Structure formats: C-alpha cells, structure tokens
Amino acid sequence: MHQVHDMNDASQVGEARRRSVLMAGRLEFDEDTCGRLALVVTELGTNLVRHAGNGRLLVAARAGAAGESVEVLAVDSGPGMDLEHCLRDGVTSSTTAGTGLGAVRRLSDEFAAFSTAPGGTVVLARIASRRAVARARPQPAERFAYGAISVPAVGEIQCGDDWAIVQRDGRASVLVVDGLGHGPDAETAAQACLQAFSSAPCDAPCDVLARAHAQMRATRGAAAAVARLDADAREVTFCGAGNIAARLTSGLGDRSFLCQHGTLGLQVGRLQDVAVPWPEHALFVMHSDGLGGRWDLRKTPGLLQCDPAIIAAWLIRDHIGGRDDATVIVVRASAGSHA
C-alpha cells in the first residue's frame, strides 16, 4: 500500500519526509540512503507546493532483484513543465538543500518523469539501499517491467485492495484483489486471497482462484483476478471473479477481459481460464473498481511509452472516484521479450 501525502502547504512536506524515513528505517536502510530519501521527498514535495499548487506524494516499499527500495511518486494536475529545462540543477526548488529536480535524478537509483502542458506531471524516484545492492547476487534479467499502486479509501488507514506479481522462467503471474467494502475486514479478506496466491502463484489462474475461494470462507469475501503473462508465447491467460477490470492496451487498440460473476469466499460461478494473444508493444493493465474503467491512454501522447509506474500513477490521479480503495497494476514485456 502506498502512503498518500497531500501537498497543499509547505508544512506537509516535513511530515511526508518523516514518515518516508521511518519506512526506510523499518527496511534497515543505512544512514546515507535515509539521507538521500529525505532529500528526494523534500525536493519533490516542495516542488508540488510551489509550482503545482496542489498534488500528492505516493510513497511505498518495493521489492526488487537487488533488495528493497522506497518508491516516491510526485503526482499533480498542474500546468506541466519543460522537463529538459527543469532537470538542470537549481531550476525548480533552488532554495532547498538538494537544488531541484536535477538533484532528485542524481540522488535516485531509478528516475523517470512525464509531463504535459497543460495536463500535469508525474515524477518517479526509487531509492535503494547501497548495502542491499552491494550484497545482492547477480539475478537473471526480469522479463517484465511493472508499476503498481494501491491506496486506501479516503479516511481509512487500512486498505482492502492488494496486488502481487511473481516472475519466473519468462512468465509473470499477476493478482489484483478487492475485499468487499473497505477497512479492516476488507483487508483481512484480501490478505487471505494473497496468501492463497502466494502458496503456488504459477498454477493456472483458475486453480489459484479456486484455492482462494476455499480458503476465504471465513472472510467477507473479495473480487479477484489472476493473469499469467508469457513473454515467449506472447500470450495472456486470465481468470477473474467479481468486479476486477483487465485490459491489453496499445496505440492500435484495446482488448478487455471478462470476469465471472460472484464473490470469492461466498459464491462464484465456474472459474475458467481464457487465453488470448499478447500483441507486440501492448501493455497489460488490471485494476479494482475503485478506479473508473473509462480511461484511454492513447488520449495522452507519449504516456504509453512511459515507465509502468508513471502510467499507474496517471490512472490513479485521473480516474479514482468515490469512497473506495483503489489498486492498479501496469505490466510491460521488457525490451527483447517479444522475439
């Protein structure tokens, strides 16, 4: 789950920095890494207050081949910016200790940004522990790049949505789950589904959901979907129950997947996999019903080519609605996966 920090006033920057550094401390980041993270959060938060007038910082831990990192997304609907100009040191928040967006890029282990004028900006920064990177063993290159965001309903601390992705042998298994309602009982249902997925994530999607259905009987139930993405066969195998949306989208068109009616843990119809071709250059997007389904990435030129985390943040910014938890995951086959 991402921490959500509204950035409407300079006083909110310090709280975002404090909570982000606490997160890094729980991950046992070293002092240098915590310092880099503090500067990044300060710069991005200050930029939102000064130049966007409003906006949000989304902060979460993220697992990777080299260990865990902290992901920071700065999201706004402001006037947009000239990224090439603003990435020069000192151009944006030049009176802070880090000297602007250029410093954010330099301090980050991963960095990306996208902006339209008008239309707003999303900046992505990931900060990894130097110690974790140093001790990590060489890992095979992951075949899929992804970005995922999960945020609780307004006023809630716990989130009834969750997601997971497991990559093995050129395949990825992806889960999105939405516990009924929101709050602690919804979170309990979602965690039961996540445990069923984690026990054997590479099983056929219908088998994963059947196992989750059986293990969730004591909960209030959930909507959930599982997709198995195959980079070599260029195929997506999908099964879902309830109100989870999934779509393959590219510059040429979209293809949506249908879920079975019902609720895992309560009552659900026959769970059956469907396999469809994965067109080259298409993204796979799956989300809970906390995100509206009437989105079209093609309406924003350049967005389809962005880092999946930036696309996920853009969708959350523009299409979240109502008082519900929301989760979205965006997956792209890495360069060279589609031979």
Regions found by a protein language model. Give the residues of each.
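C-terminal catalytic subdomain
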Residues: 4-9, 13, 210-220, 279-339
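N-terminal entry segment of metal-dependent catalytic domains or homologous docking segments
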Residues: 129-180, 185-195, 267-269, 273
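PP2C/PPM family metal-dependent serine/threonine protein phosphatase catalytic domain
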Residues: 139-160, 209-217, 242-275, 279, ...
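Short acidic, Gly/Ser-rich segments with clustered Asp/Glu that frequently serve as metal-coordination loops
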Residues: 79, 179-186, 290-295
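Catalytic core of PPM/PP2C metal-dependent serine/threonine phosphatase domains
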Residues: 185-253, 258, 271, 331
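Conserved beta-strand-loop-beta-strand hairpin that lines the nucleotide-binding pocket
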Residues: 1-5, 45-139, 168-174, 229-231, ...
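Bergerat-fold GHKL ATPase/HATPase_c domain
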Residues: 1-39, 137-167
